[in-house]
Structure formats: C-alpha cells, structure tokens
C-alpha cells in the first residue's frame, strides 16, 4: 500500500473508530520555516500539527528488553494494557500515524513517572494509574509522551541519561547490587533505595523545559481534538505533578526521620545494655531515672558514632550499621534530584492554558470518569493497584524497624495476581531477611517466584545468581547467562553481568566483556568499565575521589547524628 493509500485508510479508520476525534490540520507553510523540516518538526500554534515526520525506528524488542532490565521492570497487567493501548490507537489515528510501531507498557514504579522511547513505546508508572482521576488525564499523559515521539525529540536532541548516570554511580552502585542477598549490613530501605537509584535513571530522558512545552502543546492539541476535557485532562495532569512532588518530598523526609530515630534508639539501647549495672543516683524531678554511667556511655557512643561514620562502621548486636548505608540514601535522593522527569508543572500549565485559550473558550466537556473507573475496577487491575498501594506502608514499617509487621504486609502485597511480581517479591524477600526467621520462605525463594512471571525482573535474577555463587559458582554463572539471553542481551544488563564475572573470579572475562561493551554500547561504556574493576582498581579510583566523598560523608553525618 502506497503512502497516499495508507493516509486515506487512516482517515477512514479515524472516522469509523473515533467519531469526535477529528483529523488535525497541518499548516501549509511550516515545512519552509528556517531550521524546521519533516525530521525536525516544531509546534508553533495550538490546534495545528506539523507534517508527519520521517523516523528511523530502533529495534522495538531491544527497547522493551532494556526497560524490562531497568529497575523493577514491567508489571503484567494485560487488561489495563489493552485499555491504554486503545487510547494510544486513538492518538495514532488522529495524527495520521496508525501504522507507527510501539505500545503502552506499565512500569513497576509507585512514583509519577512516564516516558517514551525512540522505538515508539510509551512507559507509564503504576503511580500514575493509582493517582489519575479520569480518562482525560490518562489521555493527556499518553498524548504528551507520544508528542516526544512524533516531534522526533529523540533524534533531534541528545537527551539520554545513560552515560551521565553511569558516570555518577560508577564504582558505587554496581558493587552494592552484588552484595549478598541476606547481608544483614543492609537496612531495608537502603537496599530498596539503591535499586531504585540504579533503575529508571539511565533510560529516563532528561528533557529541558522548552521540549516539554512542545510535547504539552502537541498533546493538548490532540486531546482537545478528540473531545477530551482540558480541565480534567492536561490541567489535572500538570497540577498533579507539582502536588505529588511536594507530597513525595514530605514523605521522604518523614521516612528519613523515622529511620534516623530507629537507628539512634538502637544505638542507645545497645549502649544501655553494655553499661555497668550500678544503682541509680537519687531521682530528682528534672532528671530521668537513668544511671549517670549510662548517660555518659550514650554520649560517648554518639561521639564515637560521629567519628566512626567517616572511618568505617559501627557494630551492633544484630547485623552491622555502616557509613555506606547512610550514603545509599544520599545517592538515591541525589540522582532523583538530578533527574527531574517533569519540571515546572504549574508554570507549564499556566503557559499551556494561554496557548489553548481560544480552543477551549466556551467548551467545558465533563470529565470521562466512568471509563477510567471501569478500567481500574476490573478484578486483576483493582487487586494490583491495591497491592502496590501497600508499598509506602511497608517502607514506613521497615524505617521504624517494625519488621514483623512489615513482613505481614509484604506477604499480603505479594499474593494473588501479584504473587510473582518482581517489585513485590523483592519487598517480601527484604522483609523476610530483616524479620529473621519469622517466615518459612527464604529471601531467595521469594525472589525466585518472579521466574514464573510473564514479566521477569533482571534485578531479581542478579540477586538470585549472586546468592547461588556463594555455594556453586558454575551453576550461578550458567543461570545468569541464561537470564542474560532471556532479556535479549539488553544493554542495561551488561554492567551487572560484567560485575558478576569479576566477583566470581573471572576478571579476564569481565575485562573482555567491558571492552566489547565500550565499543558496541557507548552509552554504557563507563558503567561497564567500572563494573570490571578489581577491588585494587576500585580503591585507586576511590582515592582519586576522596575530596568528593568527604563532602558527601560530612553532609550525611550532619543529618544522621545531630545532637
């Protein structure tokens, strides 16, 4: 079928499928604007789209596998994906791109994140599905992300984070990933924070605001032409970004506060347990009934803690609390601050509302709430959203060291339709390790559930392989290499496999693979090379970064042990 026939067919499908979703006019002279062409389309006015640009499409499956290997991977929600892809189909028909590749996939993130890729895929987080209140809002998100694809932003702008991110965390996070599964040196939240820091960052594009505004204008144009409400759609979408960011900052601050309090209380309790058992002095109204020796011991312990924070670690009765744990949280929060996937929501909404003012004048269609509610309340979707909604409570319980309660809640989350979900299996395994024998299931058994899922997580496969390596290196190597093939040799998985070779004694294999990576996957060059470094090489690299490390440690120590 030639291009003209395909366009005619698209128009016919548009009328048949969509009714209210009208074809969007293209300004006749836009291709002649200096610096603008079919490969570099630009939105100039609301209501009009530039001509459909030509695209060079990367491999769709490679893109999908790379996102499966990223962070917690994807969530198996076939009914929800069917609904979302129906909305994407509307967008494609309305823009004359019905034959373009790509689909909507759901990421295992409870934050508000959405992204698209040069291959044509759109990735939307569970957090958005939990938070959005109407189909208008979901359509706004999808049309915005499709705008990045249509406007060829991936080809025109250098927006990849992979190189910068791998440089930022090189020599640190890959080592953390390869810690033993049941390493009691990890606090529950530390382990979770580092996996989240490693995931999502490398593949999330670093859009500048003017690029985001182009995608906003594109999405609003498509959304309004398809009869969706601006108030319930784009306005709600952009305003929710800012309100979520405020709430997330407050919640993270509360989590850190609870974690700090629990750590300090543990130190105080251990110090009191070691204090000499001597009679207390006479009680006075202004003093607590605590032995003076114990008070002195507590003060002494806190003083030593401050010194030990920069030197190494503090031994407690259960496991080990190290300075590295404090840095884990700083790394996660620091990378999140560097990558803002949706800057300036309120300011963008102000600008966008002015651009579309003439298009929405006198038009106030009601929000399409029922279709969205029907989709969310489909049985599997409802259970999945409810189970992932338990994650913040699990994190808070772990921050408070209430591990038995955290385990009970994690077991509930990783059940039913979500028994094999990667993120929830990880939370369950983590809670099992922290609760110390309160479960018949081991952490690795919890992680291994994910092998039965249609959506495996590379991160859990790495954890399983590292655990295997402690007893059978050859079996572990065979397992992780099989998983590497299963994930289509995804670029995101290369540093982990290289680090596995290094840690299992095959330094030459690690070096050889790192060199191949540096040539064939330039975005991951630094991460691959760092993952191949031996402890001696890492120590040398660390020595060169001592000044930076001292700044980070000093900042963390001020927060963790304020008197």
Task: Give the positions of each predicted feature.
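Bacterial N-terminal signal peptides that target proteins for export
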Residues: 1-11
């Amino acid at each position: 079928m030639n291009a003209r026939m395909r366009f005619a067919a698209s128009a016919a499908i548009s009328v048949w499928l969509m009714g209210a979703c009208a074809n969007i006019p293209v300004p006749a002279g836009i291709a002649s604007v200096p610096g603008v062409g079919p490969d570099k389309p630009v939105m100039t006015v609301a209501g009009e789209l530039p001509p459909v640009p030509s695209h060079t499409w990367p491999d769709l499956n490679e893109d999908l596998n790379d996102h499966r290997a990223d962070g917690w991977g994807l969530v198996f929600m076939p009914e929800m994906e069917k609904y979302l892809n129906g909305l994407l189909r509307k967008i494609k028909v309305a823009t004359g791109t019905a034959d373009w590749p790509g689909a909507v996939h759901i990421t295992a993130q409870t934050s508000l994140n959405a992204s698209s890729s040069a291959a044509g895929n759109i990735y939307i987080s569970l957090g958005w599905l939990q938070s959005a209140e109407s189909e208008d809002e979901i359509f706004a998100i999808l049309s915005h992300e499709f705008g990045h694809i249509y406007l060829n932003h991936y080809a025109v702008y250098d927006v990849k984070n992979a190189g910068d991110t791998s440089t930022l965390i090189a020599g640190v996070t890959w080592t953390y990933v390869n810690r033993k599964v049941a390493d009691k040196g990890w606090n529950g939240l530390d382990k979770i924070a580092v996996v989240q820091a490693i995931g999502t960052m490398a593949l999330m594009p670093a859009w500048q605001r003017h690029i985001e505004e182009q995608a906003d204008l594109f999405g609003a144009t498509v959304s309004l032409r398809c009869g969706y409400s601006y108030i319930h759609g784009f306005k709600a979408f952009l305003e929710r970004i800012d309100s979520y960011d405020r709430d997330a900052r407050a919640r993270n601050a509360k989590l850190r506060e609870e974690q700090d309090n629990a750590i300090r209380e543990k130190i105080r309790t251990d110090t009191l347990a070691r204090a000499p058992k001597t009679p207390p002095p006479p009680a006075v109204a202004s003093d607590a009934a605590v032995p003076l020796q114990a008070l002195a011991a507590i003060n002494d312990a806190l003083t030593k803690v401050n010194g030990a924070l920069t030197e190494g670690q503090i031994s407690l009765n259960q496991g080990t609390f190290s300075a590295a744990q404090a840095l884990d949280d700083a790394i996660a929060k620091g990378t999140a601050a560097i990558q803002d996937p949706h800057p300036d929501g309120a300011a963008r909404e102000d600008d966008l509302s002015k651009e579309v003012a003439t298009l929405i004048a006198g038009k106030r269609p009601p929000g399409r709430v029922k279709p969205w509610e029907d989709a969310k309340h489909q049985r599997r979707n409802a259970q999945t959203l409810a189970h992932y909604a338990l994650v913040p409570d699990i994190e808070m319980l772990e921050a408070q060291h209430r591990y038995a309660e955290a385990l009970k809640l994690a077991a509930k989350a990783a059940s039913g339709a979500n028994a094999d979900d990667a993120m929830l299996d990880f939370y369950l395994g983590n809670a099992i390790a922290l609760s110390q024998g309160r479960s018949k299931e081991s952490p690795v058994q919890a992680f291994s559930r994910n092998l039965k899922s249609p959506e495996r997580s590379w991160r859990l496969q790495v954890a399983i392989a590292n655990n295997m390596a402690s007893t059978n290196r050859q079996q572990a190597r065979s397992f992780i290499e099989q998983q590497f093939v299963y994930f289509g040799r995804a670029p995101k998985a290369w540093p982990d496999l290289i680090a596995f070779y290094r840690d299992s004694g095959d330094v030459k294999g690690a070096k050889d693979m790192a060199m191949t990576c540096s040539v064939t996957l330039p975005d991951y060059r630094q991460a691959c090379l760092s993952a191949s470094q031996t402890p001696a090489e890492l120590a040398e690299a660390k020595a060169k970064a001592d000044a930076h490390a001292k700044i980070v440690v000093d900042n963390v120590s001020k927060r963790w042990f304020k008197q």
